[in-house]
């Protein structure tokens, strides 16, 4: 049986998650990409709690132009950095969730770095 793109992504995700884990001092910034929206959340793996979350779905109601493109993904990165700053989170571990570090995933990372997150 041939492997689909999504199956390959899931294998990469498992391989990546073996190597990285978020802690209380340095939580994990997870990015998920669907066909319509980009989601980002900061997770503390020690407690299993989501500390901060946002998406183009949430931002789109507040700002025009927050679509599922690079510009919208960059807005998600800046928003997650702003929300993390409110919870005094400065350093995170970036989890690309099996996606290639390109396009919208890279735009989220660049936006988060511009917003002040370190990774």
From Swiss-Prot:
Pfam families xrefs: Ribosomal_L18p
Gene3D superfamilies for the chain: 3.30.420.100
GO biological process, one term: translation
Entry superkingdom: Bacteria
Keyword Magnesium assigned: no
InterPro entries: Ribosomal_uL18_bac-type, Ribosomal_uL18_bac/euk
GO molecular function, a single term: structural constituent of ribosome
CDD domains the record matches: Ribosomal_L18_L5e
Keywords: Ribonucleoprotein, Ribosomal protein, RNA-binding, rRNA-binding
Any GO CC annotation of this UniProt entry: ribonucleoprotein complex
NCBIfam families: L18_bact
Family affiliation: Belongs to the universal ribosomal protein uL18 family.
Subunit and partners: Part of the 50S ribosomal subunit; part of the 5S rRNA/L5/L18/L25 subcomplex. Contacts the 5S and 23S rRNAs.
Protein function: This is one of the proteins that bind and probably mediate the attachment of the 5S RNA into the large ribosomal subunit, where it forms part of the central protuberance.
Name of the protein in its database record: Large ribosomal subunit protein uL18
Organism of origin: Nitratidesulfovibrio vulgaris (strain DSM 19637 / Miyazaki F)
């Amino acid at each position: 049986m041939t492997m689909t793109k999504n199956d390959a992504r899931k294998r990469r995700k498992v391989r990546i998650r073996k190597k990285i884990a978020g802690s209380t001092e340095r939580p994990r910034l997870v990015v998920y990409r669907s066909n319509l929206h980009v989601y980002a959340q900061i997770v503390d793996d020690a407690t299993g709690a989501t500390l901060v979350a946002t998406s183009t779905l949430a931002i789109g109601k507040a700002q025009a132009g927050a679509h599922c493109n690079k510009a919208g993904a960059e807005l998600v990165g800046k928003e997650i950095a702003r929300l993390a700053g409110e919870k005094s989170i400065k350093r995170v571990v970036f989890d690309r969730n099996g996606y290639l570090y390109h396009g919208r995933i890279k735009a989220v990372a660049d936006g988060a770095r511009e917003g002040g997150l370190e990774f």
